[in-house]
Amino acid sequence: MVSVRCAECKGKLLCGRSKCPLLEKYRFLKEIKIDSRILDPSPPSIFVGRVGYPKVYAGPLVSINADPVYADSPWLWKSIEEVIRLRTSMLRVSRRFRVEDVREEKKELTEMQEMTAAIKPVDVEAEIRKISRKAEFDDVMQPMGYSAIAESIKLAENPKIPDKVEKVYYDDMKAYEALSYLYNHGFSTYYLQKIFSAGILGERKSRKLVPTRWSITAVHSIVGEAIKREIAAYKPIDKTLLFNYEHFGNHFEVILSPENYFFQLVEIWQRKSFWSPKEDWIGVDSEDIRPKRDYSNLSGGYYAARLPVLEYLREKRGQASVLVIREIKPSYYAPLGVWVVEEGVRKALKSKPEVFESFDDALTAASRRVENKEWRALVSRQTSLASFFGF
């Protein structure tokens, strides 16, 4: 969603935002020049679309005007402007496939999988047939620049693939087993999302391309549920802790109190932020230690916020009742993807916590830093219900 009457506003900021998201993305796109034949590095990274599923466009992201490694390392990025500049310098080069085509091990798709699994940038050669000069912004995925339909796509060098990735591929592990195995051996969620999307994981007879948007949430969900099963045997932590962090116009408060596992995310979109131009919007979702069956009403941001909390609890070998507050401010003028949430909560939990005697004391302290005050009633009600039912 963009603010009302964009055609009338024409970038004059009548919506009240600090910057126009439409003009901002095209400001960088004007600098991109693309030839009919390209030979450029991929970070490596892949994009799989969802329009037309099960026939989708898929292919590598190629870096045209930026360092390919930095352009695919969200934990290093510093500002919204930098993210837009970096990501719109990446060209989506694609061809159309059926999602099941990966089972046939065609050379074109096999090379794409090898490129995606590589640990260093890989040069990609492509003959471009058609270019769409349209950028894409999404609440789950990172921003995307121009897209190009190619006559052909091939690797210009041999990629180096980690041994453990080759193991899960040739051992025919189920997808959730492969994800847990690789995650527990130190592979990042960003890497896992890419190889999951490329159809590298799972039993050979069941492998398929997975749209990028779906793969991001799937990895957060599958890995998170695996960690929940681990921490179910742990005792509650012994102190009430409060962490906070802010980046990219997203403010985070994280409260951990010594109780059995319960996770709750409160999401507050301030008026004039990207998805809520007219008024503040508040959403809440929660869970206990049982597997979360229904897809969260807060979309992929819920699973992205939950994962670093579960990582922290596993590291501390404890359970906790957890409240995460995410307040999105007007300075978040363009959606950047759920990595903003994952990294924000992760960095909050790496900071030095405040220690309190009770959850209520921590909640009061957190409230002072949250500008919207209406959310507290929702938290109080949810917490009392959780206690009543013994969650």
UniProtKB/Swiss-Prot annotation:
Entry keywords, A to Z: DNA damage, DNA repair, Metal-binding, Zinc, Zinc-finger
A single BP term in Gene Ontology: DNA repair
Residue interval(s) of motif PIP motif: 382-389
Entry function: Involved in DNA damage repair.
Source organism of this protein record: Archaeoglobus fulgidus (strain ATCC 49558 / DSM 4304 / JCM 9628 / NBRC 100126 / VC-16)
Classification via HAMAP family: Nre
Positions of C4-type zinc fingers: 6-20
Gene Ontology MF: a single term: zinc ion binding
Quaternary organization: Interacts with the DNA polymerase sliding clamp (PCNA) via the PIP (PCNA-interacting peptide) motif.
Protein name per the record: DNA repair protein NreA
Family: Belongs to the Nre family.
Domain-level remarks: Contains a predicted C4 metal binding domain at the N-terminus, which could be a zinc finger DNA binding domain.
Matches recorded under PANTHER family: DNA REPAIR PROTEIN
